[in-house]
Amino acid sequence: MCEYLASQGYVVIASRSLGARAIVMTDDVEGVEAQAADIAFLVNGARSLPQADMDKVAVVGFSWGGLSNVFAAARSSRIKALVSLDGSIRFYEKIWSAAGDVRPARTAVPMLSLGAASLPFEELEQKKNRPVASYLNSMKYSDIYFGTMHPMQHGHFSSLYGFRLARDDEFGDYRRADVEQAYRAVALYVHRFLDAYLKQDDKAMAFLRQSPARNGIAPQVMAMRFQPAAATVPSEAGFLRAFAAAGYRDAQAIHARMREASADFALSPLNLNTLGYQLLGGKNARGAVELFKLATHIEPKYGNAWDSEGEAWEALGEKEQAIAAYEKAVAVDKNQLNAVARIKALRAGN
């Protein structure tokens, strides 16, 4: 696989599977964290290669590597695509669920999952008859391709040990030639997937979206199911679009809905204060009040946002609301000198 991708123009960097404290990998959180750290090291090291485009990074993982690459993607925005070759992300629910930062919103990148046919957990989950939860089915922010390679067993996804060094009687009900044919399909799909999502190749994308049979791969060799992204990750930009579409009203309600959709969604009170000032400068004081109120809803002790809200109320001619906002600014931060001055001025009728 590595040699093939390199022959297609990709810069390929690989490492072997090593445990945290020993050569042998352990199937626990410590083991996957160690391998995820190795991936992060390799990705960072690629920055020293002049031919490497760091805006187009993918991580391909076999077996345990098909779990640790998900951990790595959750912690690095550099990783733009994932490939799982019968990866352990399908089987080790207790491990990925124990990592608080490994969640769909943090791994919102396309994934190609090619696996053996023995345990189709993702389909079982959708039928509400699942032995374990499927992380892949929960990746609602990602395009996911589920490929099933019928002739292949787990070890066959490693070409060296899976079939090059295997005896002819180690292929179950299939022949060596059947497994080799399936492996060629695996390599081809990985190549096309990377071309589609890293190089934005339209022909490669069309290849992925049609059935394997249309691509010359027999149904007894491969089946493919495509699960398109069902939503976009809630973001500040998305919040602002929704806020504008709502007529610059209901900022707190929009924020609450987006928080409910994703626990990872967060807005910066500092940014909200800045954005509110931009609306205030654009003669949209009502919208500015909404953002200032949201800022103090998120951070009640943010005195500057209370002071900003006071200014917006003044722009609207709402004296009492302005005084109330300024008083809250001073209550949480005695250094809000503008608020102190405006309270005196407004009470004096100025």
Model regions and ranges:
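The feature captures the conserved acid-bearing segment of alpha/beta-hydrolase catalytic domains
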Residues: 81-154
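Residue-level signature of tetratricopeptide-repeat
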Residues: 309, 316, 342-343
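Primarily recognizes the serine-hydrolase "nucleophile elbow" in alpha/beta-hydrolase
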Residues: 42-106
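Short beta-to-alpha linker loops that shape the active-site pocket of alpha/beta-hydrolase fold enzymes
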Residues: 11, 16-19, 88, 152
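Alpha/beta-hydrolase active-site loop
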Residues: 27-51
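Alpha/beta-hydrolase-fold serine-hydrolase catalytic core, especially in secreted/extracellular enzymes
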Residues: 151-155, 160-303, 320, 324-327, ...
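Short amphipathic alpha-helix adjacent to the substrate-entry channel of hydrolases
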Residues: 1-14
